[in-house]
Curated annotation (Swiss-Prot):
Pathway: Amino-acid biosynthesis; L-histidine biosynthesis; L-histidine from 5-phospho-alpha-D-ribose 1-diphosphate: step 2/9. It is an enzyme of class 3 (hydrolase). This is Phosphoribosyl-ATP pyrophosphatase. Its EC number is 3.6.1.31.
Amino acid sequence: MTAFSLADLDRIVRSRAAASPDQSYTAKLVAAGPAKPAKKLGEEAVEAAIAAVQGDRAGLVSEAADVLYHLLVVLVGSGVALEDVMAELERRTAQGGLAEKASRGRP
């Protein structure tokens, strides 16, 4: 397993988002406003789902990496810290999945 973490990627995305849009694809996405990176996230998520359904392991790995990257870009552009998402995941995993889902009041 690699030592590279989601927190590492988050630091890279945040650093690149602060760069000039002329110098950084990440900065260009963030500068475009929330719709552009959100659209890219959706596209990559669909591609990941298709790869999973098709049993394309290599494709799924690649698309999952794209999903994680674009999710972090959306978070950065929306002013949401990865730590907030991780805290929410930690809160949710403190109880069983079905109990946690029921506590949200959604099916």
